[in-house]
Design a protein with these regions (language model features):
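N-terminal alpha-helical targeting/anchoring segments
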Residues: 1-99
Length: 99
């Protein structure tokens, strides 16, 4: 398992927990959700499109969903230094230097 697969699994667990708490609707499958290498002009280590994939189902803008999900991702992982939300709704993760 590589770092992108690891963080994709973490993100899936987080959104599943939000679903169980009634805070977020999720599809039957996680098709289309990814965690990947960000474009070179972004200062982050991983980028995910989770908010964009879930926005239509939740009837919220991708930016609104990303703003809701991103602090929860950061709270659950002590290796994350910063999380930024960028249009149209990507969540960009930067790790602490020790990682």
């Amino acid at each position: 398992m590589n770092i992108f697969e690891l963080y994709l699994d973490k993100i899936k667990l987080i959104i599943s927990d939000l679903n169980k708490n009634g805070e977020l609707l999720i599809p039957d499958t996680f098709n289309g959700i990814n965690a990947e290498i960000p474009p070179p002009n972004f200062d982050c280590d991983i980028s995910t499109n989770v908010a964009m994939v879930l926005s239509k189902l939740n009837k919220k803008s991708p930016l609104e969903l990303a703003e809701k999900i991103s602090p929860i991702i950061k709270e659950k992982d002590s290796l994350i230094d910063t999380i930024n939300v960028v249009k149209p709704g990507f969540i960009n993760i930067k790790f602490k230097p020790l990682f």
